């Protein structure tokens, strides 16, 4: 039967990509349906109970700047917060939070259930309705047909999911959930390139069976950071510690002796696993010279004894898992609550997508999250928001949007995926961004919130807070610029004594703040009139101290932008462009890049080839002008 309501956008899947996609589309005012196989698992953290980290927190802050839910849910569910790389420059500093699984999931569900324009329905999706290369809706497992011209697939690890524990395996989307077999079969019928990837998770431990007295305590930071630009530490629940222990020679012996029982090393698993989150058996094999590896025991929540032993993800048989766990100091008597496992699943080559995350072959069909070959909640959430927003824009008859590489880590993520593709689960790092001094986590709102407001993603509450912050920065910079300190005055002498910086003549406070040895807090302690908003103070200090470096990056971006944004016609015949080698012609013809900048990042496409493309575009434009004048 047909569902009586027609929708503008349908989102399949209620994980981190799906929830952000559905919320984004609904915030933009279009009628949105979120279809999930189980309402109770909306926003579930399937693997580690943490949000953020190097590169990842930048994505979370960008999601937040565009009105997304992940950061605010983290503030409501976060039970430990830390700033990573706190002694390094602001470009690579990152916020990381341990989250209570129950509180985080509850915060996401509350947001979903209170979002106007959003309907939630519990049914698995088994089929797509496609007519003349255009999606028209979906069909559920009980034959119910939902109609919409825009569908966002956020299927996670469920497509053809196969769970491995030792040499045994069974079908599953994750532990305790069924896989999506019918939809996987349907998608394989489409003219899209498909592959298999693998990820894994460690056994969960009962904290009552662990001896913490022989481990190293890792408390959170004080003062406690927040994840959202709208967040406050008053939102945080009780804060707890993590604990650090290590594997040892005995652990490594157990693993080495049982590699023949590993599905990874016996050839049972076809999919490639995440390079930057390897299983413990992979670590032992690849880094045989290392005597030990860190294991972080992370609490799963405030109302459970379960611990997540970060660092020992494994798919070895259960008896071996038990030996591994009990060989580690402090866990000699540990009880495993849930075994670790690996899961294989289908993903689709992201080079078959546009920047909007719409597939090139089926109009209105968008992919986001692990279906595109990424790993991580944050990467999924970022793609989900972008896909949901673009599905909404398409339903409104508007142009799609994707931030550039110099505007957001979301732009870096999407450009990497659709230009280069991926052979292994893709994880975000700050090192992937060329302009990371500009793409800091602290200024994500200044980069993106105005655009989010224009798109309809940002509500009045967030916009008011953003405007107050932006105006506060301008006011404080102006105040510092117009406040002067002279030598041989009480303030001048205090500055010289505190910072070891004698004043030789009159300086304004902004000049003084640009010096590396002078910090904002110390300066205003002497001169008075500190701002109340710590985000304003942080921005003023970073912008002042790094002004020269930031200006140089902006100049470089301006030089490159003209060619970067040059559009390539959809009907361009690369095979007919003389001067291009056959290899480059074939690469361009297969990739069909949307811009000159994207073409320049295709492996094997040389700067000389880009110059030839530019000449061809100019000739083509001139020829069309002559035709029109004739």
Swiss-Prot record:
Keyword field contains Cytoplasm: yes
Essential cofactor(s): FAD
GO terms for MF: flavin adenine dinucleotide binding
Cellular compartments per GO CC: cytosol
Gene Ontology BP annotations: tRNA methylation; tRNA wobble uridine modification
Main location: cytoplasm
Subcellular location: Cytoplasm
UniProtKB keywords: Cytoplasm, FAD, Flavoprotein, NAD, tRNA processing
Residues at which NAD(+) binds: 273-287
Highest rank taxon of the organism: Bacteria
One Pfam family linked to the record: GIDA
Residues where FAD binds: 13-18
Stated role: NAD-binding protein involved in the addition of a carboxymethylaminomethyl (cmnm) group at the wobble position (U34) of certain tRNAs, forming tRNA-cmnm(5)s(2)U34.
Family to which the UniProt record says this protein belongs: Belongs to the MnmG family.
HAMAP family with a match to the protein in the record: MnmG_GidA
PANTHER family tied to this protein: GLUCOSE INHIBITED DIVISION PROTEIN A, PROTEIN MTO1 HOMOLOG, MITOCHONDRIAL
Subunit structure comment from the entry: Homodimer. Heterotetramer of two MnmE and two MnmG subunits.
Full protein name: tRNA uridine 5-carboxymethylaminomethyl modification enzyme MnmG
Naturally occurring in which organism (per UniProt): Pseudomonas aeruginosa (strain ATCC 15692 / DSM 22644 / CIP 104116 / JCM 14847 / LMG 12228 / 1C / PRS 101 / PAO1)
Organism classification: Bacteria, Pseudomonadati, Pseudomonadota, Gammaproteobacteria, Pseudomonadales
